[in-house]
Amino acid sequence: MENSTTTISREELEELQEAFNKIDIDNSGYVSDYELQDLFKEASLPLPGYKVREIVEKILAVADNNKDSRISFEEFVSLMQELKSKDISKTFRKIINKREGITAIGGTSSISSEGTQHSYSEEEKVAFVNWINKALENDPDCKHLIPMNPNDDSLFKSLADGILLCKMINLSEPDTIDERAINKKKLTPFTISENLNLALNSASAIGCTVVNIGAQDLTEGKPHLVLGLLWQIIKVGLFADIEISRNEALIALLKEGEDLEELMRLSPEELLLQWVNYHLTNAGWPTISNFSHDIKDSRAYFHLLNQIAPKGDRDDGPAIAIDLTGFSEKNDLKRAEFMLQEADKLGCRQFVTPADVVSGNPKLNLAFVANLFNTYPGLHKPDNNDIDVNLLEGESKEERTFRNWMNSLGVNPYINHLYSDLADALVIFQLYEMIRVPVDWSHVNKPPYPALGGNMKKIENCNYAVELGKNKAKFSLVGIAGQDLNEGNSTLTLALVWQLMRRYTLNVLSDLGEGEKVNDAIIIEWVNQTLKSANKNTFISSFKDKSISTSLPVLDLIDAIAPNAVRQEMIKREDLSDEDKLNNAKYAISVARKIGARIYALPDDLVEVKPKMVMTVFACLMGKGLNKIK
């Protein structure tokens, strides 16, 4: 280690020892490289996931002195010194929950077969299996797979043909995948691979990070990757309605002196916490500040269940009586079991076992609470005429597409609300790096921001983001100032975000075309040439061409790139009603994803001929076509 490396104080050393002990679950004196990556995921680093992984890989080469893919405490300290010297560990949190029930498996890929270990949580596997079994128990397409046994590895085998994953994505975000595009019968390795591509590209389109997962990983059932993807998909569904514009009853959670805009900026996790505390306050019980330590004794849960259970006096069904006698049970595990028996009366015994409650598993307890909220929120929209209803307008489809695109790339923090979550420009900087615009991170103010002058720090970031856009990225940002980003001016923010997405899309094409700069005219020419070569009658004059509303140019292009991928009997070609156009568009988007095109656009974008999103569809298909030639 070079002498220029930052020294670590005795106080910091003690904190590191404490953190190390918490992830050294078997007290062996070592943690695996994968646990280290998990640790960084837990830390609030203003860097995207892929960047953290790169750093860890590079530094492991130095820190893992004996190359055993395990890190001792001494190696861990030298690793932290390296990170401190790179100005990355400033926001390192020492609160890492001790994780129990971790299964470690040896690496299986050719790269990791030299003895790396990946760990996965047995509890998560059991919880997800039970959730999927219940969710898909009546689906005829899943009869050969459901029910899965939570106590063996059947989950990893059952997901291998892609059908379950596609079904779970549609449960979380209905209509994401056109069922006609899923291969269901007489599956071959090729048609299974198509299903997995469809699942991965569709997961990406709903905001899941899939940058390091390939179809092969799912075929091989790599547990840590499968569980990571499943959790993201399940979470999208659990959190879908924990959003004020979609669920106005959440306005009831407004605290004294809090305005609606503050409430609307909260993440689903923060809203859930506020929801639990709203009911605990009504029950006269102390509030909680997390879904781990504070719920371990189950007592807060008893009160929550008692508050939200139907009383039979409204239109929420017959009364359900919650038995509180288990509340005074002395044994934590038994008390948790009594509590879950009461949750079962509400049809909500999901995600956690008594042991998961007592150990304070934050992920599974969050899922348990989200499911309770979705089933019995116990909220009623207040008759408050002071509420500005304009604030309750939900995000547009375009805004959601941009948000999902960013999240799928692994930006940190996760974007829940497009404008308020971009207010400090940290995610904008990460996107700049992804489009190869260099960011000088020493110019960037990082959280936590001070209470006084904190917003000024964010505006400085936004000013730098606009400056980079104009001078380095050569974007057209006329009339856009840093303050516009900070204040969430929708028109001006979208102008920047669109140019980021456009550049990202075109960079992929330039890489395939030996670096040749790609523009709209080149894409249109390639599309028409490819259609003509395949003897298709369709063509496009621009990305505003009205014929695109039928999706026929898109479907014909897919057929030209990947013959037999499109089933012609699924397409309506003449006398198209609005419903026919939408059906064609749904099928086109799903089949494009199935052949490997990572498309974020929605079927409506084709039907309504939204030129920006139409461009991304054709650009992604061109990328697929060029890749095939290579």
Swiss-Prot record:
A single GO cellular-component term on record: plasma membrane
Recorded superkingdom: Eukaryota
Ranges where the record places region Actin-binding 2: 382-626
GO molecular function terms listed in the Swiss-Prot or TrEMBL record: actin filament binding; calcium ion binding
Location of the protein in the cell: Cytoplasm; Cell projection, Stereocilium
Residue ranges of the region described as Actin-binding 1: 108-381
Residues bearing the modification N-acetylmethionine: M1
Domain EF-hand: 11-46, 51-86
Binding-site residues for Ca(2+) 3, renumbered to this chain: D64, N66, D68, R70, E75
Matches recorded under SMART domains: CH (SM00033), EFh (SM00054)
Keyword match S-adenosyl-L-methionine: no
Positions with a binding annotation for Ca(2+) 1: D24, D26, S28, Y30, E35
Any one Gene Ontology BP term: positive regulation of protein localization to plasma membrane
PTM (free text): Phosphorylated.
Family matches, as InterPro entries: Actinin_actin-bd_CS (IPR001589), CH_dom (IPR001715), CH_dom_sf (IPR036872), EF-hand-dom_pair (IPR011992), EF_Hand_1_Ca_BS (IPR018247), EF_hand_dom (IPR002048), Fimbrin/Plastin (IPR039959)
Residue ranges occupied by any Calponin-homology (CH) domain in the UniProt entry: 122-238, 266-377, 396-505, 517-626
Keywords annotated in UniProt: Acetylation, Actin-binding, Calcium, Cell projection, Cytoplasm, Metal-binding, Phosphoprotein, Repeat
Pfam families, per database record: CH, EF-hand_7
PANTHER family in the cross-refs: FIMBRIN/PLASTIN, PLASTIN-1
Protein role: Actin-bundling protein. In the inner ear, it is required for stereocilia formation. Mediates liquid packing of actin filaments that is necessary for stereocilia to grow to their proper dimensions.
Protein name (Swiss-Prot/TrEMBL): Plastin-1
